[in-house]
Amino acid sequence: IRVLAGDIDGHTGPGKSQTPMSIAHVTVMPGASVSIPWNPLFNALAFVLAGAGTVGEGDFAAPIKTSQLAVFGSGDRIVLTANPTQDSRTTAFEVFLLGGQPIREQVVQYGPFVMNDKQGVIQAMEDFQHGRFGHIPPDAIQPFRG
């Protein structure tokens, strides 16, 4: 378990955020299972980067595989189990885990913009169109070559 931001079971990641959250990259070897303590005040979701396995345990275990997303209900643990065999492209069950304290605010979305009200979305669109979001040089982001 690599904690990227926030805190998981007393381990703190290097990333910072404006709201309480936890983000981790979890690697589960074939046939293994991990039970991760989770803040019961946080929501949680898991996105599978590679491999296949299950989320949850017992009667609540659900199958999940590459590019699928699981949204968890309330609770204080997240259980991830890797299938005993993985496909030839991966050696493990790789999961991006994230969650945080729900902000319980109105959300308005239009295209890639998400704000708290319609006026906020309109302002974000205008800011983007006028170049106020800044500039990323073409060579600043290197492609992922997994």
Model region roles, listed by residue range:
Residues 1-146:
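Jelly-roll (double-stranded beta-helix
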